């Protein structure tokens, strides 16, 4: 996403488009943008910044490539809406790792952070560490080993961008649904992710 911003600023549109098309291929293959294109990291995604790449490229590309990118964007959005939703209706970071991988991640965190998880559920700790990895905030104090419990503002803002972009540029028959989803997310973010003060 951020490399593409530089490529576009440097008028290397074709290079930026090829980056986005490569990601679109992976999204269509897996349903999401893998954390890395290696088998061991397919249990978690990247944050959904692909939509930013699409928005940045739309003014420069033809209809055929726009359709490919928007289709991948919609597929990734559907993944987040089916696999990473909290009871409040907002999205969260997570993973699909097995128990063994989660326990391994807890062990890895103990070594990296020089911290012992006494009497803790190692699988739960590992689950949340992998969720932090999905967020891009690997081994940081941001989520206090409870990442999968948070409706992260950045994540939900990125998905709001998906909803508004797909409403504007996606299939016309789905426009009303995406507008409603964006309005619902906006209301929930004000309700659950703010301190109640006027944010406008």
Spell out what each predicted region is.
Residues 1-51, 55, 151-153, 164:
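Substrate-binding groove/exosite segments of carbohydrate-active enzymes
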Residues 8-20, 57-74, 167-186:
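Structural helix-adjacent loops and short alpha-helical linkers that scaffold large soluble proteins
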Residues 26, 30, 53-60, 76-83:
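Mid-sequence acidic-hydrophobic segments that form the walls
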Residues 29-30, 64, 87, 173:
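Alpha-solenoid repeat scaffolds
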Residues 44-64, 193-200:
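C-terminal capping/lid segments that line or modulate ligand- or cofactor-binding pockets
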Residues 63-150, 195:
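Active-site acid/base region of carbohydrate-active enzymes
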Residues 77-98, 157-200:
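Catalytic cores of carbohydrate-active enzymes
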